[in-house]
Amino acid sequence: MISNFERKYGKYAVKNLTLYLIAGYVIGYMVSLVNPTLYGLLTFNPYMILHGQIWRIVTWVLTMPEELSIFTIIMLILYYQLGQTLERTWGTYRYNVYLISGLIFTVVGAIVLYVVLTFVYKDTFSSQTLGSYIGAYVSTYYINMSIFLAFAATYPEEQLMLYFIIPIKIKWFGVLYGAYILIDI
């Protein structure tokens, strides 16, 4: 089925989508440094989206999941390499579908969660408070980690250097991260 869509819409696929995602992070960091108030208007907040600030459906992608540090820079370089490899392996269209559907499902899931929690906690919290609370947890962290897990599933025998010294097969990093996700839930 995806092959039919690929033949029809493959010409619209964005090459180097990972690079654009990382460039978005850089733009987001620059905005946060120059104008923190404007950066606050870019974040995801279901309450504000449902009250007219619809740009937040898209601009939350510019917000970084972590604060800027040397580890963030290393992470971005790693995700660029993993994303480029997945794009070459799967093809541009399928990689686009993978990332964009992850972004769309994140937005849909957050809005559904907001609506459900608004009804459940309507007497305890204001809908604006719930929107801010949910918005604080919506980031591209899980999108980035899904790139990592997809790479681990596609290339389980590849090695990463832990602390730039110890070679470990990426499948074990994937297993550890999968266990972390299950414990975190």
Locate predicted features.
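A detector for small-residue-rich transmembrane helices and their helix-helix packing motifs
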Residues: 1-185
